Amino acid sequence: MRILKLTEDTRKDILQNLLKRSPNNYGEFEGRVNAIIEEVRNNRDQAVFNYTKQFDGADINAGNILVTEEEIAEAYEQVDTTLLAVIRKSLVNIKKYHEKQVQNSWFTTEDGIILGQKVTALATVGVYVPGGKAVYPSSVLMNIVPAKVAGVDRIVMTTPPGKDGKVNPSTLVAAKEAGADEIYKVGGAQAIGALA
């Protein structure tokens, strides 16, 4: 990570350099990402395992890719009670917000005419939560809670493991609290390809 010290003397140069960066300059990555997704499409789980080893340094296989209830219980033991309270309070707030967005399928006009459209939740949703060196329990909540409120039946979450093959405890606790049905230890483009 590069740390920039913003002072009156450096402010102008730093801001100009930041503004020069193009948000649409993805050309160098697009080819690599497409190749990974194609490899996952063709070689399925084995490609996911290979890329997880290559990018995350973790030995993931069919026997350990799915987070177990034991791993979740262990995560609860490792998470500070203050963080758990914050996760639970945030979950309640996010849920209340999204409950106000739920659409009714039908409504009645002043004349008594029933109008509307059938609003139906998706059966399954895939949620990708970044991980690695940083931890994002808020991303877990902001993705899973709206899906739960919408009535999604099955929520599958992926997040990268550490080199030890484990997922950050706060990420697991947030996922359990939010209602993830399955959590897989895989990140990056290979996770997106597998979800698709």
What label would you give each PLM region?
Residues 114, 191-194:
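An acidic, phosphate/nucleotide-engaging active-site surface
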Residues 1-122:
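N-terminal Rossmann-like NAD(P)+-binding subdomain of aldehyde/semialdehyde dehydrogenases
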Residues 108-173:
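Conserved small-residue-rich beta-alpha loop and adjacent elements
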Residues 2, 185, 193-196:
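Glycine-rich anion-binding loops and their surrounding alpha/beta cores
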Residues 171-191:
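A glycine-rich helix N-cap at a beta->alpha junction
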Residues 55, 162-163, 190:
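Positions that flank functional sites
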Residues 44, 153, 181:
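Short acidic/polar active-site loop segments enriched in Thr and Asp
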